[in-house]
């Protein structure tokens, strides 16, 4: 069974994104769930990959800002 350490939800247009930092016997991970009109899709990022995930996301945001 997963233990939720922290959970945050954001709404963007007609979608909700749920960010759950979880832990189970295999380790800690981030689950990002997209809820769009009742349909849910999720990705899971193991804790060791969170810094790299953030680095790439920061680069994407910077490119978006530069593109205007």
Language-model-detected regions and their locations in the chain:
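Positively charged, low-complexity terminal tracts
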Residues: 1-68
């Amino acid at each position: 069974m997963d233990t939720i350490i922290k959970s945050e939800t954001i709404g963007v247009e007609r979608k909700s994104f749920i960010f759950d930092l979880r832990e189970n016997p295999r380790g800690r991970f981030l689950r990002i769930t997209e809820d769009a009109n009742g349909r849910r899709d999720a990705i899971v990022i193991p804790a060791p990959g969170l810094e790299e995930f953030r680095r790439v996301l920061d680069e994407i945001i910077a490119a978006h800002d530069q593109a205007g």
